[in-house]
């Protein structure tokens, strides 16, 4: 994706405010008009390669039921739907992103839910989901054990979860917002719920380096 003048301005402003609490909050849930638009613009091009690779790793097959936690700009939804899943639940708590998703996606297989992923009862039944995807979202889930219990509830036996994140950069962000940035500590928690494997992924440039964590329901 070729960067525009506005993209370069967004990068400049991001570097100025990168480690502030207001930037952290808007990376989690865009609110402030200026900062929120900076984060939205950065997400579109800064995660492009990571998102494409994450969707490939999710290995969606025809008639899968998918949950994406934090669908954001919808980049991953556009890629997932090409693999002909039966259903995608796109979860998003940001009002800004939620409005964009509902405006941009009209495929009947995609259900956009403005729900927190720690409680999906009444929306998603027990053991009905094949795969769950979280891209740059795991940092914000607090308390994380409540989310993991809910993922365990909705996931089919031998179903999988793919968590992808840039834990190095995330560890420098405001800790009151970015809660789960210690990779080794996170893996220890995940192992209490699922079979876990982790891989460092280098797609050729620093902005596209990330960790991919695969969880399988025991």
Task: For each feature predicted by the language model, list its residue ranges.
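Core SAM-dependent methyltransferase catalytic element
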Residues: 202-218
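A short SAM/SAH-binding and catalytic strip from SAM-dependent methyltransferases
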Residues: 131-144
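Conserved beta-strand signature within the Rossmann-like core of class I S-adenosyl-L-methionine
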Residues: 158-166
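Conserved Class I S-adenosyl-L-methionine
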Residues: 175-193
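A short glycine-rich, Lys/Arg-flanked "PGG" loop and its adjoining helix->strand segment in the class I
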Residues: 145-157
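Class I SAM-dependent methyltransferase SAM/SAH-binding core
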Residues: 67, 72-120
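A short acidic, Gly/Pro-enriched loop at the edge of an enzyme's catalytic core
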Residues: 122-132
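Conserved SAM-binding loop and adjacent beta-strand
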Residues: 35-52
